[in-house]
Amino acid sequence: ANHSLYGLGECAPLHDLSPEYDAHYETFLHAVSRRVEQSRRLDREALRNHPSVLFGFETAFLSARASLRGESHLTLLPTPFSLGQTGIPINGLVWMGTYEEMRCRMQEKLREGFRCIKIKIGAIDFNEEIRLLRLLRQDFSPADLQLRVDANGAFSPEEAPARLRELSAFGIHSIEQPIRPRQWDAMARLCRESPIPIALDEELIGVNHPREKERLLRELRPQYLVLKPTLHGGMAGTEEWMRLSARHGIPYWVTSALESNVGLNAVAQLTAYAAEKIWRENAPENVAHLPATHGLGTGQLYLKNYTATRLVIKSGVLHDLTL
């Protein structure tokens, strides 16, 4: 093999979330590999409905292109971030637990330098979650800590308005996906009336064509998008979301989806590139800046990981020290 053509990518579908992930996934992956070898090109249009496959091949192509330039195969999109000159602020993640467990985790995240925490809600009794949030806000004010919550579609359309009103007492920055996807009338109403800004996440899965994306943004008008390349169209599909959201004045942040350091490296570099180029070139001048904090800390969950990348978190900021 010619080492100069070396490229590294990652396909990391998620069970129950990636619509293309089924018993035939690996067979399809091998078929795409053969087509790419024969044609020596990547047919992105043919892979629109297979975002994790598209993401893997896109990152491998970008990696090979970097190798051909004589650069590290990990420098996919040259930016100040990928050159180690700047970092990307990221949120910490705290799961629901007892008050003592959550307070200890919050204190640990603050000591580590995080100033934005995402809390998963909807897994335990809602009244208990409210009690825990009330206690936590007594310890950590909005000036100390930005709180984002992620409901993962836990609320019904009927109960969601009242629950959002209760949550709004705690200075919540935003709530991700309060109700399950594909309930557009209810979601549009929540986006109009919720006292907490709404960020769409699972709602974007399976919405892969530009016309569909345009319609979703026009009809739902969310306050934010949460973009995950493995789930939301690969690199190219995510860039489409970014351009459209910028034109609609809807800020986004980018989140990894349990990829290893190979995928996380690509997602982080896309995040930095998009902030430099895509948002700046497409957003109206009167639209707010992108949220500074992204969700790129999931590599910490691995016991063993790809070690050639040197993605390091310092004081709540992700740095690329690979070079």
Q: Which ranges hold each PLM region?
A:
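Flexible C-terminal active-site loop/helix
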Residues: A257-L323
